[in-house]
């Protein structure tokens, strides 16, 4: 649950910032709007990739993949902000979309794999509370952006969240 909440919150922040972040990195309004759509498409792609990876490997490998993609997103955007590279920003947004899209697929596969189909609807409903809890992170990130005047500060927060999720991959045990 904590893992899903952390990973989900990174995606929520990037989705929230995507348009203005693209403009900050030099995209035209038309391109920035298109990039928000690309991020959304990557969300859908993440669901498929995560499902295939889970079915062909295992839970831990899939979680590690999602964690690396999430961390790569924060790092790419931080590098984009430092260098002014729109291309790195686009990469980071695409990775965030893939990561964010992976969470629902990973959650449902994880729940069935660990707890079976019995009470799946209840378990999945509880797992989806990650969106409620994670929704506070964009508010915090927005406050950090406003108080610091730069996107670097909120993306350092996202990098920290991503790094915190790494050891969670190794702490999860079948009940």
Where are these regions (language model features)?
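A late C-terminal transmembrane helix in Major Facilitator Superfamily
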Residues: 114-148
């Amino acid at each position: 649950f904590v893992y899903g909440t952390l990973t989900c919150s990174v995606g929520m922040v990037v989705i929230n910032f995507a348009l203005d972040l693209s403009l900050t990195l030099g995209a035209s309004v038309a391109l920035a709007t298109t990039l928000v759509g690309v991020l959304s498409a990557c969300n859908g792609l993440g669901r498929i990739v995560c499902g295939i990876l889970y079915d062909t490997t295992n839970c831990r490998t899939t979680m590690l993949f999602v964690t690396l993609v999430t961390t790569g997103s924060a790092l790419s955007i931080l590098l984009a902000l430092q260098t002014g590279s729109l291309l790195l920003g686009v990469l980071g947004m695409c990775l965030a979309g893939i990561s964010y899209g992976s969470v629902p697929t990973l959650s449902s596969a994880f729940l069935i794999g660990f707890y079976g189909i019995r009470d799946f609807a209840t378990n999945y409903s509880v797992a989806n509370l990650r969106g409620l809890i994670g929704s506070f992170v964009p508010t915090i990130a927005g406050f950090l952006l406003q108080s610091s005047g730069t996107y670097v500060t909120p993306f350092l927060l996202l990098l920290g969240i991503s790094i915190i999720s790494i050891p969670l991959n190794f702490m999860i045990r079948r009940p």
